Amino acid sequence: MVPSIGLSGGLALFWKEGIKMEVNKSGLSHIDAFVRGDGNFGQWHFIGFYGNPDMAKRAESWELLKSLCGPNSLPWLIIGDFNEIICVSEKYGGAVRPIRQMARFKEAIDFCGLREVGFVGPQYTWLYQKHDGFQIRERLDRALATQEWLTLFPSAKLFHKSSSVSDHSPLLLSFLHKPKKKKKSSSDSNPCD
């Protein structure tokens, strides 16, 4: 666990019994771990990530992301609050996000060879709401993985859960997602493409 600073940040990592998790290193904005699954899944790399909430320091987050993806031959997954969106469709309300700011995040993702893990639930994972009803909604939280990881876990989905105590949606990763036939609320593709 990485503690919060005031009301911002903080990371917690929970896993199911039977999964072997070895934390390699951690800092204020990340948890870097190796996962040893059972049976056919072997070993893979996991990173819990928190992007700097200060826009002036966001470039430091992208440099950290690039350094974490460095020379690693294992399949890997990164989940977290990146405090950034990839494209304008990931934001509702408020001022328009500068394109260059989003592009820097996308460049770091591309540098690491990461792809979106499909999600189930509301598109936006963060809500800012004033007493007068004004809202800003953004998709700040996500799961990204290498193609090798996605091949290893083809049914994996990230669930955006509802919360009454946080402005962020809790995230739950399921490796064996079976879609419901009644309601379509999942995303297997990136709306920014």
Regions found by a protein language model. Give the residues of each.
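A shared catalytic/ligand-binding motif for oxyanion handling
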Residues: 1-193
